[in-house]
Amino acid sequence: MSLRRPAKDQPETFEFNSSSLEAANIVVSKYPKGKQQSAVMALLYIAQRQNNNWIPLAAMKYIAKFLEMPYIKVYEVATFYTMYNLSPVGNFFVQVCTTTPCMIRGANKLVEACKEKISQHESELLGDKSCSWMEVECLGACVNAPMMQINDEYFEDLDKEKTLEILDKILSGETPKPGSYRGRVNNEPENNRKTLMDLKNA
């Protein structure tokens, strides 16, 4: 397991804005009285979305107070799960899956594209601090390998050229279309076979 440390530069304060507070209260209301600490993961995610895709220490302290639980417990959860970013990742956070199915299908080319367009090293912000990238474990879209996730969207069936095009779009302020880049609908077969009924016995 990799060592995960919070960013050195931290904001002094954090609090939920009105929409985040509403979302947090809805989540907490789903738990019995005295069990609201179970909402910690959801509230960390809400805080991350509000704070430009990362969670500062001030947010962890705020959530601890909000849920009436020890700060160290919130810190333990936030630093354990890699879905929580402990330092700034920019407006566009690119996650490239490099688990076996994606790697077999050419994920290394997607990594090359990220190094060319964003930075040579993982978790290193682009010069204007708008974007960063990192390799991640399985994102659950193996049938559409290789693929990457940008913020909340999946981009699938990629190669280096298509990845460069997508990165060019986000860096120029455009919104690329998520989904398959081989024209597939969801995870249909690449050769468009819809049935096995016409296959002859071996």
Question: In which residue ranges do the predicted regions lie?
Answer:
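Signature of N-terminal electron-transfer/Fe-S-associated modules in redox systems
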Residues: 1-202
